[in-house]
């Protein structure tokens, strides 16, 4: 009984609390009771384009290759259960590629079995020169060779003699 009386008193106290609202508080300060949509009093004027004086014609560069219209002439793709594969393709605009890959077991725990790939690709440059690149990709990385790969210039004779002299006459520090 005492519990019911105490509970009823608490409910009455909570219900009797007055909410604090200061005089500056408004529930929605942006609400307008006399809302009217915007009405334009002016009528829009139509836009008339201004003619531009003619300019000098721009020279159009001819397209080098019509690669978007290339058709495949030859195509082959073979994947074997042991992980080896072979593929090749050739298009009618002179692009060709071929590659063979074979898994190589390098041992280890767990065993490392990377695929060693060997192949080539070729195309015709905008100047009409055929370009060919042969490559090997194995545990030593990607190793391309071909006429499109730049080569370093030869070492000048004076520097080669200086390096030979240093290697022969100056002992290495241990």
UniProtKB/Swiss-Prot annotation:
Component of the cuticle of the larva of Bombyx mori. Residues 82-153 form the Chitin-binding type R&R domain. PANTHER family: CUTICLE PROTEIN, CUTICULAR PROTEIN 65EA-RELATED. InterPro entries: CHIT_BIND_RR_consensus, Cuticle_Struct_Prot, Insect_cuticle. One of its GO terms (cellular component) is chitin-based extracellular matrix. This is Larval cuticle protein LCP-22. The lineage of its organism: Eukaryota, Metazoa, Ecdysozoa, Arthropoda, Hexapoda. Keywords: Cuticle, Signal. Residues 1-16 form the signal peptide. One of its GO terms (molecular function) is structural constituent of chitin-based larval cuticle.
